[in-house]
Design a protein with these regions (language model features):
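Alpha-helical oligomerization interfaces
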Residues: 30-44
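Weak global preference for isoleucine
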Residues: 5-7, 12, 46, 55-56, ...
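Charged, low-complexity interaction regions
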Residues: 17-31, 46-54
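Short terminal alpha-helical segments
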Residues: 1-24
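Charged low-complexity stretches with an acidic bias
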Residues: 52-74
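Intrinsic disorder/low-complexity segments
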Residues: 10, 17, 51, 60-61
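Amphipathic alpha-helical interaction surfaces
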Residues: 18, 41-48, 65, 69
Length: 74
């Protein structure tokens, strides 16, 4: 069974893909907020500070900047 971080990564990568192909700023924002909601849900589901730190790090270093880049391009 996959762990929460793997599932979260797949979910956010799917939202990033949809944002890239949408070519619509409001849709990109929608996918960004859905991805952030997934991060919040994942954080609520786990009770492990180390995993939470990994999720926060991935959000701040990978996923959020990727969404910001897409928003700048649209």
């Amino acid at each position: 069974m996959e762990n929460v971080i793997d599932i979260l990564g797949k979910t956010i990568n799917r939202k990033l893909h949809l944002a890239k192909v949408s070519h619509d700023y409001s849709m990109v924002q929608t996918f960004f907020h859905q991805a952030f909601g997934a991060v919040e849900l994942a954080m609520a589901m786990i009770n492990d500070w180390e995993k939470e730190a990994v999720i926060i790090d991935k959000w701040e270093r990978e996923w959020e900047p990727a969404f910001e880049k897409i928003m700048m391009e649209v």
